[in-house]
Amino acid sequence: EIADGDWSSDVCSSDLREYIDLTMGDREKRVLITYVSAYGYTREMAEAIATGIESAGNIGIKILDIEHAGLGEIESELVRSDAILVGSPTINQNTLLQVYKLFAIINPLRDKGKLAAAFGSFGWSGEAAGIIAANLRALKLKVMDENAAFKFRPEEEKRTELAAFGNRFAKELLS
């Protein structure tokens, strides 16, 4: 028998509440924006994309730095989310290791069909966004046809383009 206030009753109650929240009726759509950033540019991109998503309406947004968030936290947020964006700089013509670790927690059975998109900053070649998109497709997510990739820091004009990208992503999610 579980005593009131016992940790296991709290866990069971919170899990049940979460299950009900996830499965019952209309709820706010949720977007998870994950990124890793070498010089802060990809973080700035994530923030600009979030601004565009916010402008589309009633969508909850969670932004997580893959390098600092635990994989358990990221997976928990992914389970609650209807869509995911993944960002990375291009270093040595590739995305970063942290992004590959993120791919390991995306479950094609559980997450199949979730809307997804890739974004990233680069200095020279810019392959990261394409690599991310290809991996998201392989994991059975519904990847937008466009990625957002910009050279170095996204200045004001680029941030406006990123917000528009986020808005298009949100509208596709809501459609």
Question: Predicted regions span which residues?
Answer:
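Short, highly selective alpha-helical patches that border small-molecule cofactor pockets
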Residues: 42-46, 50, 99, 129
